[in-house]
Amino acid sequence: MERLWLLLRRLQGQGIQVIVGDIVLDRTAFDVPEHDAARFDGEPLRPYNAAPDALLMNYNAVAMTLVPDAAAGLARIQYDPPLAGVQRQATVPLATPGTACGDWRAALRAELSDPARVAFQGVYPASCGERVWAAAYPDAKSFAARAVEGMWRELGGKLTGSVRDGKVPAGLKPVFVATSPALAEVVRDVNKYSNNVMAQQLFLTLALRQNGAATFDGARAALRQWWQARLGDAEPPAPENGAGLSRDARISAQALARMLQLAWQSPVMPELVSSLPIAGVDGTLRRSQSRAGTAHLKTGSLRDVMAVAGYVHAASGRRYVLVAIVNHPQAGGARPVLDALVDWTARDQ
């Protein structure tokens, strides 16, 4: 949301304070099917279930910051971004003094399914201190419009019309252009924190650059073409949407290892390796029980899958490609085994 704020401030800095007419949001760069946020795991309000969108903002999520005020007996709630047309409860009562923090989200008894209203029926334990709760907005299609209008008005801007979706006419000269972060920065955010929707955005962009239209079919075709040109004899992956948040995506451990070997020889190898979580240090591996700093590995976990893949830095000075994929109803129990495998590989003497 910082980038949207800076963009609107930049617009106002050019002397534009009043927009007569509408703000038109053009999200036609991506052509993706309708998305059911509850389909994967029945948790539609979890930000990780957000759908890819050419104008995705803040993962279609609202960050609610709760700040307890013991003297007033309540917690104040700050909302980011401020969504236009949404009633937001400003405070919630504090729980009885001495109440343990515990499951504070459940204690709040939030009502988040109404696109026009955010409400809480419960209480907030002061012992929790300041906490942030990020929840997906229930009407993803209107999120960008509400966020743009809400932030524009919060910055003091005026709008005589509305914010709506549409296609910008060809040939218009941009007032200014905002540049995205470098690809290495995007990949780092995807890999360090297993950001599924960002992975899908990047996947679709493969098709956009190659075909001028971003579809999942086009992205899969672009990946197959790349794979065939470089790893033709290895079994190609079968991605569904470009992310690990899938029950249908497939890749063999051998094929993934071949790809990692190829990547090690690439000129952009340093950027790829630095994007991977470091065992016991950061990202999704910060709590790993493996010896800290011995490996750069991407993790993957679903209810019946546990996996790691990447590079292990051994005591001998050698570098090993490591791929381990566990498919089992109790796959979560394999985490200590995978940690032990990483340590065993690192102790190669």
Listing of model-derived features with the role each one plays in the protein:
Residues 193, 203-349:
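Small-residue-rich helix-loop
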Residues 1-234, 340, 347-348:
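Conserved serine DD-peptidase/penicillin-binding transpeptidase domain
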